[in-house]
Amino acid sequence: MTEDDFSALYKVLSDSDIMKYYPCVFDENRVRNWIFRNIERYRVFGFGLWAVCLKETGDVIGDCGLTMQLIDGEIKPEIGYHIRADKQRKGYAKEAAIAVRDWTFNNTPFNVILLLYEIYK
């Protein structure tokens, strides 16, 4: 994820359906801060949320990665993702989450990762 991904990530993070678990949808300033926070996570932790790109075109359709979250009173690693609405339910989040899982187990000391998601009929 870089500043060059702003326009693509704005389409994702400003969507109220995608951001329903956040206090608000992101405006332009919040998206810029989101990008900068992830760049800082790369520096501090060596990981964060990465841009999810289509293999065929390179188009950014969201983000997915590993972040440290306060869960049940403890800081724990969690896989998180946001995928553009028109690309949802096509396996991109699953593929990205599996890649993050594999990367995490091969490159960090973590042996447990959390992932929260909704199950649809």
Predicted features by range, described:
Residues 26-30, 48, 75, 120:
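Short, conserved alpha-helical segments within structured domains
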Residues 38-51:
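A short helix-loop-beta-strand connector motif used in the catalytic cores of GNAT acetyltransferases and
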Residues 17-37:
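Conserved GNAT-fold acetyl-CoA-binding loop/helix
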